[in-house]
Amino acid sequence: MARSIKKGPYIAHHLLKKIDAINESGSKNTIKTWSRSSTITPEFVGHTLAVHNGNKFIPVFVTENMVGHKLGEFSPTRTFKGHTKKNKNKK
């Protein structure tokens, strides 16, 4: 179910403050965040965000195509190690 338009997109306040500070200073630092549910806005474009996946921080470089998506979509939480191979010679 989509979020109401009158409410606007969810963005963590601490993350928005950090992005605004970096945009004003012009530096290109990596920002660590645990806020996987924050929506990517146009202010984020061109920055690298380290998104926590429950184990470690995954660096995500934000491009224009990512605007409107959530940060958690680009930091997978589960690792797929493959299905077990059947042994044909088993008797």
UniProtKB/Swiss-Prot annotation:
The entry's function note states: Protein S19 forms a complex with S13 that binds strongly to the 16S ribosomal RNA.
The record's keywords, sorted A to Z, are: Ribonucleoprotein, Ribosomal protein, RNA-binding, rRNA-binding
Gene3D superfamilies this protein is in? 30s Ribosomal Protein S19, Chain A (3.30.860.10)
GO CC terms of this entry: cytoplasm; small ribosomal subunit
- A Pfam family that the UniProt record links to this protein: Ribosomal_S19
A GO molecular function annotation here is: structural constituent of ribosome
The record's family statement is: Belongs to the universal ribosomal protein uS19 family.
The protein in question is named Small ribosomal subunit protein uS19
A Gene Ontology biological process term: translation
* Gene behind this protein: rpsS
Keyword check for Disulfide bond, yes or no: no
- tRNA-binding as UniProt keyword: no
Query: Which species is the source of this protein?
Result: Amoebophilus asiaticus (strain 5a2)
